[in-house]
């Protein structure tokens, strides 16, 4: 199956930037596998109405139960608690894990980001359950209008963060209101 509308969508959202389009398509392809050797957090950022949520939604629909949302604050700095292990349990078995719309000015937890992108087994626990070792299969994707703050300057965090700028703008009159249906029709080819 082919997906010409999906390819056109990628060209549109990257404003014809061939290198960015290729990078974006590779990140989509990686989301299909359980391979975590990339050790990455894909951070899609840019003002609204640019296609980033559309892409993550269509990939989530393509992957079905292999995709799911992360708790909104899972990757953010907050009081350290046992809740983190419960949050990790929510992404067990996922290939694509999405997190959308962080508030402006929030800080990314570098320790949690490194833990969840490092390829090592983490400890997870269902609420009131026993902890278990959880081998990573997920690719973390954040879609945000405002990039979370990152204080670290070491390569350990910055080599993991893959910044994907979304500069296109589809406003009233130029937005394709049937785009999701067009992309859904091509799911087998995507």
Regions found by a protein language model. Give the residues of each.
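P-loop NTPase catalytic core of nucleic-acid-dependent motor ATPases
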Residues: 1-93, 162-165
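Alpha-helical scaffold elements adjacent to nucleotide-binding pockets in ATP/GTP-utilizing enzyme cores
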Residues: 55-58, 108-116, 156-160, 178, ...
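Substrate-gripping "pore-loop 1 plus following alpha2 helix"
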Residues: 70-84, 111-131, 174-182
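AAA+/SF3 P-loop NTPase mechanochemical coupling elements
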Residues: 84-93, 124-143
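Conserved AAA+/SF3 P-loop NTPase catalytic/coupling segment centered on the Walker-B
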Residues: 94-117, 132, 150-157
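Hydrophobic, well-ordered secondary-structure elements that form the walls
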Residues: 100, 141, 161
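Conserved nucleotide-binding/hydrolysis micro-motifs of P-loop NTPases
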Residues: 103-104, 145-150, 167-171
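Phosphate-sensing "switch" segment of ASCE/P-loop ATPases
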Residues: 134-137, 153-190
């Amino acid at each position: 199956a082919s997906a010409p509308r999906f390819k056109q969508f990628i060209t549109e959202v990257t404003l014809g930037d061939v290198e960015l389009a290729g990078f974006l398509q590779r990140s989509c392809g990686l989301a299909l596998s359980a391979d975590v050797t990339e050790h990455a957090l894909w951070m899609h950022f840019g003002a609204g109405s640019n296609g980033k949520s559309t892409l993550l939604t269509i990939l989530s629909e393509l992957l079905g139960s292999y995709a799911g949302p992360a708790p909104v604050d899972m990757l953010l700095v907050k009081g350290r608690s046992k809740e983190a292990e419960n949050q990790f349990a929510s992404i067990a078995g996922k290939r694509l894990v999405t997190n959308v719309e962080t508030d402006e000015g929030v800080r990314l937890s570098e320790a949690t980001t490194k833990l969840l992108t490092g390829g090592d087994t983490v400890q997870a626990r269902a609420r009131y359950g026993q902890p278990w070792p959880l081998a990573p299969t997920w690719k973390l994707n954040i879609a945000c209008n405002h990039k979370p703050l990152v204080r670290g300057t070491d390569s350990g965090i910055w080599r993991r963060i893959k910044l994907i700028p979304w500069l296109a703008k589809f406003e009233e009159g130029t937005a394709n209101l049937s785009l999701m249906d067009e992309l859904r029709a091509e799911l087998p080819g995507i």
